Swiss-Prot record:
It comes from the Bacteria. This is Probable [Fe-S]-dependent transcriptional repressor. The keyword DNA repair does not apply. May function as a transcriptional regulator that controls feoABC expression. Pfam families: FeoC (PF09012). Belongs to the FeoC family.
Length: 77
C-alpha cells in the first residue's frame, strides 16, 4: 500500500493528476486514492485545479464538459 508521500510524489511527477491516474500508477484502489488526495488537500500539500481552466478548443464549448469533470490535483503553490 502506498503512503501519502508516494501519492503526493505521483501528483508532483505528473504535474496534475486525478484519482484514476494515481490509482493506476500506484496500483491502489481508486476510493483509497481519493481519500488520500482529499487528506493531502486538507493538510495543505495539494490543491484542486479548476478543471474549466484546463478545457481548450472544442472541449471548452462542449455541453458534456461539465458532466465528465473529475477532481484534478496539483502541488500547492
Amino acid at each position: 500500500m502506498a503512503s501519502l508521500m508516494q501519492v503526493r510524489d505521483c501528483v508532483a511527477l505528473n504535474g496534475r493528476a486525478d484519482a484514476r491516474l494515481v490509482s493506476h500508477q500506484l496500483n491502489m484502489p481508486e476510493p483509497m486514492v481519493k481519500a488520500m488526495l482529499e487528506r493531502l488537500t486538507l493538510m495543505g500539500k495539494l490543491e484542486e485545479v479548476d478543471v474549466e481552466e484546463c478545457l481548450v478548443g472544442s472541449c471548452k464549448s462542449c455541453p458534456e464538459a461539465t458532466a465528465c469533470q473529475t477532481k484534478v490535483y496539483q502541488l500547492r503553490s
